[in-house]
Amino acid sequence: QRSLVGSEMCIRDRIQIVQLHGTDKKLYELVAPLVMSPEVLKQNYNYPFRTSEEYEWFVALDNKHVVGFVPVEHKKYECVINNYYIKERNVDTLKLLLEKVLEKQGEESSLTAVSFVEDRDVFSELGFLEDKVWTRYVKMKKNR
């Protein structure tokens, strides 16, 4: 196991990851201000965020403020990460969220992620393999 660098240790001490069901009232309270924010939507290329019974959300909190979230959709044969948000594109926050997703995922099924091109290295570092590359996104898979 590799040692943590200073910034990573600091963020791990500060950030709390909460897991919430896709229709949990607390989820709406936490993410509603962000998913309707023009700045956040712009970072997501104006693509809306969505949720349903089939989603599990991993939300990163720094002093009770949301600094990122990764929704995971549970489909019949796979789970899918699509349309996530990381404040200021902080790599350490993204990594922390993805590690929690992988920890909870277990051996359940394969995991597909549609990541931003800028984040492909973080996903690769955690064992995701590139499947398709588009202009803004990379479809990546992590098999169990």
List each language-model region with its residue ranges.
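Conserved beta-strand in the GNAT
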Residues: 59, 64-73, 80
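Conserved acetyl-CoA binding element of GNAT-fold acetyltransferases
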Residues: 73-89
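Active-site rim helix/loop that mediates acceptor-substrate recognition in acyltransferases
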Residues: 37-57, 61
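Short amphipathic alpha-helix that is part of the acyltransferase structural core
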Residues: 12-44
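Conserved active-site alpha-helix within GNAT-family acetyltransferase domains
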Residues: 116-135
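Single conserved hydrophobic/aromatic residue that forms the stacking wall/gate
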Residues: 1-11
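Conserved acetyl-CoA-binding loop-helix of GNAT-fold acetyltransferases
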Residues: 89-104
